[in-house]
């Protein structure tokens, strides 16, 4: 069995359920035991009219739009459902770096992959919204096809047609990170965050090796095109829902992880958060919700 087919088999076995936490008072080796939501969420920041982004991700891609959160200071977070993952959109902030271009142009969160059952229906929605039809290409050794398009802000999106047409296959969302040092990034997502490393595969789209990490129905994939790319630290990031954000903060201190925003409480939402950076400055945002907090072991 090829590594690619092994990855597909692993994804087919994905199920959705909260993960248990370690006993009270124990310090876990990584964040894994306090990851509560059996998926990750992903956010993108943009600099175009919000309506254009909402039309693309909702009307064209067909993601279900949820309520928009107003988190204060005039900041709205638009939310879309993609399988078990929430895909979030918000305007750019001023204290981060942004780089134009695609997956090879900068380090950062450079690609989001969504799964679709029907190429014809997806293509029809592109045409109905006045957009060129995506150009699909076969992935050698599989029955899948992919197309690369840009959203209205110029950020790349991969459209994957999956022949399985099962909920498990269609619920998968893949977050593509371009990194400067694969070993440092692998260590962060494996040894600090506690994601399951699936092993490298040859990347049929961008070339080289791709290192993937699984949490429930969400994949984080790492690619590297050298150490000298400019850093994009603002265009996107990953959110994890956890049962104990204090433990995340303690682990971050112990492992010398960069803190982007310290522990804080978001008024009106019963939400406690800490924002951390991976080795390339990509935001990893840990949120303790009231529901997750109640799940802690006694």
PLM regions: where:
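Bacterial N-terminal signal peptides
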Residues: 9-18
